[in-house]
Amino acid sequence: MPTEPTAAPPRPPLDWPTLGRIVLKALLLFTLLNAAFAAARPLEALGRLSLYNGLLPGRARLPYGEVPANDYNLTLNNLPAMFAAHELARPKAADEFRVLLIGDSGTWGWFLRHEATLAGQLNDLGLRAADGRRVVVYNLGYPVLSLTKDLLLLDTALSDDADLILWPVTLHSLARGRQFDHPLLQQNADHVRDLIARYNLALDPFDSRLVVRTRLDETLVARRRDLADLLRLQALALAWAATGIDQAIPADIPLRQSDLDADESWLDIAGPRPLTDDDLTFDVLRAGVARAGGVPVVVINEPIFISDGANSNVRYNSFYPRWAYDQYRERLARAAAAEGWRYVDLWDAIPPDEFTDTPVHLTPAGARLLAEKLVEVLEPDIIQIRN
C-alpha cells in the first residue's frame, strides 16, 4: 500500500526579531546605495550616455519642452545630457565649416519647426565657406534671456570643433539682475561660479538663486527627478526620430502687443536714466568672446518688433521703452568698436508683421528674411561665405 508523502513541516511564524533584521538590512542597503550615489555624483556621466547620434538621430536644438507628451521634448538641467542629445555631438565631417548659433528663445525658435528657425534657414541656403567647405549651422539657442546662460552653453559647446560663432543678443539678455533667473543656471551653479571666477565677472557667486548642494542633496532620493529626466529624454528619442517634432505649435499663435501702455519703465527701472555697467552685463559679452579664443565671434543685435500703435512714441514694444533701448544700442555699438568685435546691428531689419507672440519671436518668413540679411552683411568682409 503506497505511503502518502510526508508533509513539509510548517514554517515558523515570522517573529519580530527576524522581521527587524530584514528591515535593518534593507535600510542599511538603502543607506549605502544613497551614500554611494552621493559620493559618485554620476548624473553628468550618465548624461553622456545617449541613444541620440547613434541608434537614433540627434536633435536639431537643445531639449526644451513644457508639455513632454505633446512636444516630444522636455526641459532638463543636465548639460552633458542636453548636448549628447544634440546633433552637435556627431563627429565633424572633413568638409564641414561648423557654425555655433547661440541666443535666446528667438534663436531656439519659439513656435517654429526646427527647420524654420534661423539655423534651419541658414542651412537651407546651402552656404559654402571661402575654402569650399559646407557651412553647417548648429542651433544652440535656449529659451532664456540671459548672457550668462549663453556663456554657460558656449563654454560647454566649445569642446567641439567650431569655425564660427554667431551670437544674437538683445537688451533683456544683458539685464544684470536677471542673469540667474532660470533653473538651468541655478542648477549648474558650480559651473556658473567657475565662469564668474575665470572671467572676473561682476556677478555674485553667492547669489541665493544659485543652488548649494549638501551631501544629502546628492543622494539618489534627492536626485531621483533628475535621474528620471535622463530616462525620459532617452524615451522621447524614438518619438523625435519618427516624427521630427520637438515642439507642439498651436494652430492659432497669439500676437505680440501693438497698443502699448504709456509706461517708461524697463524691468525694475522706473523711468529714464543713464544705463551703467551695474545694469548691463557687457563683461559677460567680453567673457564669451574671450572664451571663443581663436574662433571668430559675430555679435548680432537681433531684430525686435517695432510698434506703430498707441504710445509707440514712448515704447518700441512691450519689452522696451525707447530711452532704454536707444541707450543699449549706442552702448553696444561703442563696446563693439572699442573691443574690436565683429558686430552687426539688425534691430529694425524685420517688418512688424513677421513677429509672433513676443517682440523677439519671428514667423518662418521672418526667420528666412533674417537669415538672408545676415548672409548679406557677413559676406564677404567678415567670414567670406558664399553660395
Model-derived features: positions:
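Hydrophobic membrane-insertion alpha-helices, especially the h-region
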Residues: 21-39
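Residue-level recognition of beta-strand->loop/alpha-helix junctions
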Residues: 139-141, 301-303, 345-348
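Loop/turn elements at helix/coil->beta-strand transitions in domains of secreted/extracellular proteins
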Residues: 97, 133-135, 160-165, 293-297, ...
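Membrane/wall-proximal cationic-aromatic binding patches
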Residues: 42-132, 353-354
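Catalytic His-Asp segment of secreted/periplasmic serine-dependent ester chemistry enzymes
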Residues: 306-387
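Conserved SGNH/GDSL esterase-like catalytic core that processes O-acyl groups on lipids
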Residues: 108-193
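Serine-dependent acyl-ester chemistry module
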Residues: 175-330, 351-352
